[in-house]
């Protein structure tokens, strides 16, 4: 935290019991090295997800330039995938994919279509999401109630 919250970090540091060799100021300390090695499969999975996200961002930017959407949360994203990419993305819940891509909804479709990007076997298309804007999360949802909240936000707020 020291590079970002330097004053708060220094205040916390002043309460840490001092050991021989410790510096007076937290910003002069070295960062500890991670003890656990990175899981190769985990890293590969997230590298792939981020590559897909890069392709999605390009499609969203084009939709924004075409005035189809104003912000990415106004988008319903359709991903056209070959079988392998479809099976990979289908392991991730759709609401989590929507959060990852910062859109209101994600639809997976097996087959060809959409704008091709760097990721092999993937095409993407963006359209304006159906429904109304939730006042809390700003996602577009057909089931936004009279209180202006989507079912998820209403549940979180206990309404």
Protein language model regions, located:
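Flanking scaffold residues of small Cys/His-coordinated metal-binding clusters
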Residues: 129-132, 144-145
